[in-house]
Amino acid sequence: CDPRFLSTLPAREIKCGLGEIIKTGVLDGALGDKLLQNAPRLHDLSFLQEIVSDCIRFKARVVEQDEMESSGIRKCLNLGHTTGHALELCYGRRSHGEYVLIGMWLECLIAEGEGYAKKEHSDRVRSLISLAERRIPSFPDARQCLRYALLDKKNDRVDAISMYISESYAKGREITLPCEKYADYLAILEKRQ
């Protein structure tokens, strides 16, 4: 990764990329620690070059372990994407990376609310997300996004929502939620201040 290329990007594109970087930091505990410990350096080009290289290596390891997407290991790369894609299709005003961050935020609430993640882990994930997305906005009529989540290419169900959630440090799983329950979680986004 050439840092000179990064210097040509507008701030919004850097934020979009931070969405994927932070997702990787949630999946790779050591990278997450590195991001939290070096938060003031997140816009330093040499640090970003180092982080992007770390992310590329992580993704390459995951893809190498599940090249044909047959074992399910690769599903971890979908973290935040089920909800992120649904919001992106429903509202469209933000970048893909911003929606992935918001999707991770809500899916983190789901993981905690459904008993898969402890509050300490959810707090850590929210701390990582806040490095790029300081305030999760309100989304009027967010429950309308349910239909987009059902149609998402990452969702393999027609009667429920499947998503990959983070349970703890570098550990996650795919879960399935009934549509009504997922809509209740989406409603949380309607009430954000």
Predicted regions and their residues:
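A glycine/threonine-rich phosphate-anchoring loop and its flanking beta-alpha core
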Residues: 1-40, 166
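C-terminal charged capping/lid subdomain of soluble metabolic enzymes
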Residues: 19-22, 116-193
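Short, surface-exposed linear patches
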Residues: 21-23, 29, 78, 100, ...
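Intrinsically disordered or highly flexible coil/loop and linker segments, enriched in small
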Residues: 27, 31, 61-64, 68, ...
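Active-site segments that bind and position negatively charged phosphate/pyrophosphate groups
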Residues: 37-143
